[in-house]
Amino acid sequence: MFFYLSKKIAVPNNVKLKCISWNKDQGFIACGGEDGLLKVLRLETQTDDSKLRGLAAPSNLSMNQNLEGHSGAVQVVTWNEQYQKLTTSDQNGLIIVWMLYKGSWYEEMINNRNKSVVRSMSWNADGQKICIVYEDGAVIVGSVDGNRIWGKDLKGIQLCHVTWSADSKILLFGMANGEIHIYDNQGNFIMKMKLNCLVNVTGAISIAGIHWYHGTEGYVEPDCPCLAICFDNGRCQIMRHENDQNPVLIDTGMYVVGIQWNHIGSVLAVAGSQKVVTQDKDVNIVQFYTPFGEHLGTLKVPGKQMCSLSWEGGGLKIALAVDSFIYFANIRPDYKWGYCSNTVVYAYTRPDRPEYCVVFWDTKNNEKYVKYVKSLISITTCGDFCILATKADENHPQFVLVLCNSIGTPLDPKYIDLVPLFVAMTKTHVIAASKEALYTWQYRVAKKLTALEINQITRSRKEGRERIYHVDDVPSGSVDGVFDYSKAIQGTRDPICAITASDKTLIVGRESGVIQRYSFPNVALIQKYSLDCRACQLSLNCNSSRLAIIDIAGVLTFFDLDTRVTDSTGQQVVGELLKLERKDVWDMKWAKDNPDLFAMMEKTRMYVFRNLDPEEPIQTSGYICNFEDLEIKSVLLDEILKNPEHPSKDYIMNFEIRSLRDSRALIEKVGIEDASQFIEDNPHPRLWRLLAEAALQKLDLYTAQQAFVRCKDYQGIKFVKRLGNLQSESMKQAEVIAYFGRFEEAERMYLDMDRRDLAIGLRLKLGDWFRVLQLLKTGSGDADDSLLEQAHNAIGDYFADRQKWMNAVQYYVKGRNQERLAECYYMLEDYEGLENLANSLPENHKLLPEIAQMFVRVGMCEQAVSAFLKCNQPKAAVDTCVHLNQWNKAVELAKSHSMKEIGSLLARYASHLLEKNKTLDAIELYRKASYFFDAAKLMYKIADEEAKKRTKPLRVKKLYVLSALLIEQYHEQMKNAQRGKVKGKNSEATSALAGLLEEEVLSTTSRFTDNAWRGAEAYHFFILAQRQLYEGYVDTALKTALHLRDYEDIIPSVEIYSLLALCACASRAFGTCSKAFIKLESLETLSAEQKQQYEDLALEIFTKHTPKDNRKSELNSLLEGGEGKLPTCIATGSPIIEYQFWVCKVCKHYVLAQEISNYNFCPLCHSSVE
């Protein structure tokens, strides 16, 4: 950070000033002094030149108003920026509030206690309240509209300072005896502040200043110290909050009169005076510190007595009240910034975020990329890359070097255990230094990594990509600098203060003035030089022969590293300090292509030096980005950071150096020959290129070729040779015009020469296909069909790249570009167009699979299958059907193309459905795919589960019927399959029998196929018996119930025999009833209590009725069972004795002939009765 005095304003009549305050928002400066002096000034920059911005622009007083109203010396002035009010107070205790009206300041309110003098006034952060403290201990808090909120008398206390906390909840009162008391915003005492900075201090002291930064522009770090308290003896403490037990302590070593934070709380200015041994009088100085107590520099100020200071709103200037003068100093902040490959990288803080906002602004395309980085320390750039040095974690002392590209993409983060206070970067290495040690890291960029290197990356440390050296060591460059962090913690008496590096040299500056030179990248100490200054910034020229040093006082000196000179003792030494010395320098940059050329910033002027001779200065306050090709690029960071979210290209400045300007003037005004001689005397590739271009314009091909040779431009030489082969002068002229980028003019010349082909060729080179198409169509001759097609396709690509698919389709149709057409139809969701395109393509066209995949992605199965089959990919077609759940189509395709995988696909999908408990979906899947046996198994399983739940019997019957129907379909399928195999050789009966035999072999594992209808029969009779019983057909109900004894494996025995006992009892067949009760009482599944209930019931029945059946003959035939059992009518449950009966074609069950006339559907399987 650098600072220098820039302006001085004298107060009339030599009236001594007492206080000064700069309005941060509007730029008004109020200063108060003796004899009631109160002035409001305003400095404004007035310039029409866009290059003169910021500090470089001349400033004039646009306001200089004397405010009348005070009679005594004005001692306190304070601004309310939110409400544009000025509050002042004099030695008589008179307080005046001033307001701005039509460009002038007027009294708004006056107040005078007539008891004591006002020592301090402070507005809170939002400008709503003011706190006024009087010397006699009186405190008044008032509102912005002049109303008193509360007042308090602190007895026996002399007050001298007051300040608000950021949230307006705390007030700090500074006492005349040096104590600071903490109060709440209602005036209640909380505690005394602990003042660590006054430990071991004796004698009387007073408070010089209290300033609490309110965080309005964000903080440089989370939990950053922001409350500064300083005493007249130079002791200072900076606290995070009012109760901070571990504040930052500073001993400024000066007599202090005032302190103030800058606008973002990153710099604390401490004003006062210091005794100098060589002089009798004290010297006025301003010291600058970071919130962490690091000293940034000292500004010496002329005059006898400094009394006050105030920062400008942007933090770029500071106003100092000295005697009867106001001095202004310009501040050149240490911005965190860098420049790499046309990109300006800069960081700033925001009040709404704890991190730094790092902006990568591509100045060429005017695009910006924003990254948020916690605890950013510095930004360093080189070539196309930059390094962000950050703190890894608040609680852990580890740091990170993040390698980024020019759009802010992190490429490689490197964690290190030393503080990267100083960072330098070359094209291959990053060097970071703490105060004691150096760390070097050979970084790799992804595009340069080979497969071998990627494999070896884990062992990279051993191969020397990272090394650490202590600053006191003498490395030899062989195997020194092993990766050992213990070196980094060893202290040193002479800390590092600056570093720089080039591809072959590393320079380290130390606080004593010693400069250490190392070879690089094999770090070996070559030389030590001793200088009389403490370096702040070091810079090597492009061939590493000369070192530029800017010291902490802003003095620029130069050191020749290799010159051998004889010193005063007659000894020959290496290295010489050059005579050139410049003061108030805050930035410098060597030219990348000339070791004797550099640019430097001195105050608000830029100087260019060639061989240590300066050119005339340029007025600017920009930071230098780049210096090459005799052009300097600089950036007005001050302006950018006023509105960092919207950087403007106006803030990038390009300056040509004198030799480039002179050469251009010579060529324009004198001629090529004289200019050629001048450039010969001052050679540079950029000047030769300038000459070559001028010679080309005049068609002086010899001079142009010579100049291109001198600037090593091979393309230029080839172009001149091509021009030499052309016969026509106008043709040469047109080519040169095209070379200089004046394409419209060149095209016009080609067309005037009737060379439409050359005009088309020019537009082809430029990729201007719209114009190519236009030229092709407007020509009188036949257009080249292939070129026309190419143009149509290129225009189609243009529209497609911009997602204008409709426009693209029109051109792709004309260009017959089926591939891109398919893509456009797909993006437009024009599936009809896509289908038509697929139909128009020949078989096995390479685009068909792609189109088919497009159909698959949108679930259009039929079209996808058609496309796959057209390109002879039946497997893909089947996969599509499976993917889109078209299993019947999948099976059909698999069969028609003799594919075997369908079974495994079905099984896989079915298991997936079963995992999700979608059993019915799995059944439907198998049924659609004609896998009836698997579907039946699942359906049977569902029926069994439902039966176990004892839910509605009708539902269970339906499920068993469905299962049985699926089995019947399976039987039919097997018979048909076998018929297909036997090609008419045997009879139908034989083939059907073979089918059944094959089926028997297949179904040995599952016996339920043999009597698939058992479940259905069981529940059919179960329901039928109950229906008959309820309808009063008790005998028929008993006959039906007797059948249920065969189905104990399906219906629980307790239900069967309970129903049988009920039916038998109802039809007075007590013998059957008795057997049913015996069976019930013997069931093991029943509890003792249930058995007892059955016994009691049986006792009740059989005490009244003998256990004998009345009608023997019919029951006996049912009870006998065995092989000779009669068929049963499923409509009535009765045995069929007649020879005439109906057989169901589906379930093969019987119904009495006289009964079937009552039914339209089979009573069991519900198939229609024919």
UniProtKB/Swiss-Prot annotation:
Task: Indicate where this protein resides in the cell.
Answer: Cytoplasm, Cytoskeleton, Microtubule organizing center, Centrosome; Cytoplasm, Cytoskeleton, Cilium axoneme; Cytoplasm, Cytoskeleton, Cilium basal body
List residue spans for each WD repeat.
12-51, 69-108, 113-152, 154-193, 491-528
SMART domains from the UniProt entry: WD40 (SM00320)
- A Gene Ontology BP annotation from the UniProt entry: cellular response to xenobiotic stimulus
Alphabetically sorted, this entry's keywords are: Cell projection, Cilium, Cilium biogenesis/degradation, Cytoplasm, Cytoskeleton, Repeat, WD repeat
Q: Which InterPro entries match?
A: Beta-prop_WDR35_2nd (IPR056158), Beta-prop_WDR35_TULP_N (IPR056159), Ift122/121 (IPR039857), TPR_IFT80_172_dom (IPR056157), WD40/YVTN_repeat-like_dom_sf (IPR015943), WD40_repeat_dom_sf (IPR036322), WD40_rpt (IPR001680), WDR35 (IPR017233)
Q: Which domain of life is it from?
A: Eukaryota
Q: What GO cellular component is one of the record's annotations?
A: ciliary basal body
Tissue expression remark: Expressed at high levels in testis and at lower levels in the brain (at protein level). Also present in other tissues, including heart, uterus, spinal cord, ovary, liver, kidney, lung, pancreas and stomach.
| Cytoplasm is among the record's keywords | yes
Q: What does this protein do?
A: As a component of the IFT complex A (IFT-A), a complex required for retrograde ciliary transport and entry into cilia of G protein-coupled receptors (GPCRs), it is involved in ciliogenesis and ciliary protein trafficking. May promote CASP3 activation and TNF-stimulated apoptosis.
Q: Subunit notes for this chain?
A: Component of the IFT complex A (IFT-A) complex. IFT-A complex is divided into a core subcomplex composed of IFT122:IFT140:WDR19 which is associated with TULP3 and a peripheral subcomplex composed of IFT43:WDR35:TTC21B. Interacts directy with IFT122, ITF43 and TTC21B. Interacts with IFT43. Interacts with CFAP61.
Protein known as: WD repeat-containing protein 35
- Origin organism is Rattus norvegicus
Query: What taxonomic ancestry is recorded?
Result: Eukaryota, Metazoa, Chordata, Craniata, Vertebrata
